């Protein structure tokens, strides 16, 4: 019921503002045809560096189909990898399509992904995904389709609410000082990667926008690591945990073996290692929070929590996520 109410309210809001901006000439469409209208919802966390909503200039890619992802709507070839760009109109995001999608009485199913990519050999089941060495440069890859409660999309009901989901795993760390430890310890960077010669994590892969699954490229796995260099270094001075430090990774295909994935913290210029526990499985759209204590010589795991990557009050977090 909540989803239906949300969807209905968004429709009313949209049509109430539909005259705010005309994105193209509609004089050539038939009397029983209407242009597709798009609105979006992201399941994410709040942070100044993590996207809470799409901003002006954001680009989505759409696959306009008659049901399955490879069955293009009415057989129209230009409805493959349609580019849509976000514009802000009267304080609200509107989406401009290129080319514009025209609906008739036939029902359409829309698949979406972020960020949009131009590819002459586009395959909706094989969108290139890359883990950047610099954590701040990794895109928050997303996939989505109609939200729960969505009515059939056609010329009678041309507005689609796309629910976008995260395809990567979000890994967070909070550190404090062990009980009785004194002094100031400054964290300047965090790195997550394979052990030397390891192949558990991958740095590249392909995303299936219908499922969100990523098939990793093992040829690029041994160098898979990502580093978060802190613009504002974190200082540990007592038993209070610091704000979370967050990085995204491509979910591994299986569980993590003993010592196969390691985290390296630079503290006061020295490197300290924490091995991700054995039998851990990082999944798409999940958040993993590791709480660690530092005694001046090593790191001890205090707690691990796993939650869905959903809206939450995570103010002041460090990272670069959509």
Segments predicted by a language model, with ranges:
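Sec-type signal peptide cleavage vicinity
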Residues: 2-7, 14-322
